[in-house]
Amino acid sequence: MAEDITVEQIRFKESGNGIIVEPSKGLMWMKNDTYQLTKKWMSWIQTRDYIQELNRKKFAGYGNWRMPTTSEARSLYDKNHSNKDHWGQHVPVDTIFTPGFGFLCWTSEVRNKVQAVRFGYRRGVTTFDDAYRTSRGSSRLVRDILKEDDIS
C-alpha cells in the first residue's frame, strides 16, 4: 500500500537581480528592503520618493515598484520560518529574504495624510506612525506581476 506523500509547495522563488517571485499571489518582491538597499532608515515620505527614483531607473528592469499593502506585508510574517532583523533579533520571515532587514515595514496605507501603517515583523502587529518619522523606517518593496513579464 502506497503512503500518501505531502509535497510542500514552494511559495517563493529567487529570480535573480535581487528579486523574489511569489507566483501564487502574482507578486514580485525585492530580496532586500529599503534599509538594506540604502543603509539608512526612511520616513514613509522618503520611502515614497525613493520608490519614484527606483521606478525612474527601472530597478531590475521594472518601473512599477510600490510599498506593500498591509495585507501583503503581513503575508510575509510566517511562524514556520526564522530570519534575523537588523538588530539580529528573530523575525518569522522566510530566509529567502536577506537577513538584516528592518523589522518595521512601511505600507501603502495612510490616514489623515500624516500617518501611515507600519507592520512589525517581530510581533506581527500593525501600528500607525507619523509619515514623516524616520525612526527605524524601512519597507520591502513589491510589484504586481504583469502578463508580459518574463518570470521564468
Q: Model-predicted segments: where are they?
A:
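Glycine-aromatic-enriched surface loops/turns that form tight recognition elements
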Residues: M1-R66, S71-S152
